[in-house]
């Protein structure tokens, strides 16, 4: 992994205990950036521009309750072979719900990356469009991988995220994520949840043809390792 900076964006009015916790966890691995007022793509562009020393830049968004795989950044950097403006989307991910882990291939997932030239201009950054509208701004390169590249946590406080994946064994994530996966995979409970999940997905596909098109795009994505 090369030329990578992890920026943790926080509200300028964040409490002292929160700042202290971030400083304790950092160990030099990320930079905390205070944001005053409303945050948008313009604010993100200014933040990135102040730290930029290269002719092009890649920006990826990750929510603070989600995670990316150990090789996520390296995979994205390998795929960005030119400064041509486009989004790179690693299709294969997973969701963590109250009962377990669920496989979730999704070509419009929130973990998308924008590649763009930034020599004499303010970077647009990945925040220029919402992730499900990315193709309206620039071409999208969808790539598949042999393991989940991102982990989305589905919980009661996240009203915009729906648990729609197919149950998978939590141990498949262990080598790729540096976080504890708090769930068990008992045979009966796993089989029941897998069956119910498959039925739920089938119902969604029948009830929404656009979801079938989305699944087809995900399955047809190019393998990242062949680039």
How would you describe each model-predicted region?
Residues 14-18, 96-98, 159-162:
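Short catalytic/ligand-binding loop motif for oxyanion handling, primarily in non-cytosolic enzymes
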Residues 6-10, 59-63:
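Extended hydrophobic secondary-structure segments that form protein cores and membrane-embedded regions
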Residues 32-34, 59, 87, 140-143, ...:
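Conserved beta-strand scaffold positions in the cores of enzyme catalytic domains, especially
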């Amino acid at each position: 992994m090369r030329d990578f900076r992890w920026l943790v964006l926080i509200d300028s009015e964040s409490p002292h205990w929160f700042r202290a916790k971030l400083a304790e966890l950092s160990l030099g691995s990320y930079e905390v950036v205070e944001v005053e007022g409303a945050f948008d793509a313009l604010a993100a562009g200014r933040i990135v521009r102040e730290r930029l020393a290269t002719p092009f830049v890649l920006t990826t968004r990750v929510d603070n309750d989600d995670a990316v795989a150990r090789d996520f950044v390296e995979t994205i950097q390998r795929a960005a072979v030119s400064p041509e403006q486009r989004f790179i989307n690693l299709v294969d991910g997973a969701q963590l719900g109250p009962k377990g882990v669920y496989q979730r291939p999704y070509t419009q997932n929130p973990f998308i990356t924008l590649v763009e030239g930034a020599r004499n201009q303010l970077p647009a950054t990945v925040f220029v469009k919402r992730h499900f509208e990315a193709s309206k701004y620039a071409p999208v390169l969808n790539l598949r991988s042999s393991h989940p590249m991102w982990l989305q946590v589905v919980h009661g406080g996240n009203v915009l995220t729906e648990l729609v994946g197919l149950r998978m064994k939590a141990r498949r994530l262990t080598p790729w994520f540096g976080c504890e996966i708090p769930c068990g995979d008992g045979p009966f409970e796993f089989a029941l949840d897998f069956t119910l999940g498959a039925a739920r997905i089938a119902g969604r596909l029948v009830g929404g043809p656009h979801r079938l098109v989305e699944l087809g795009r995900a399955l047809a994505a190019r393998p990242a390792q062949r680039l």
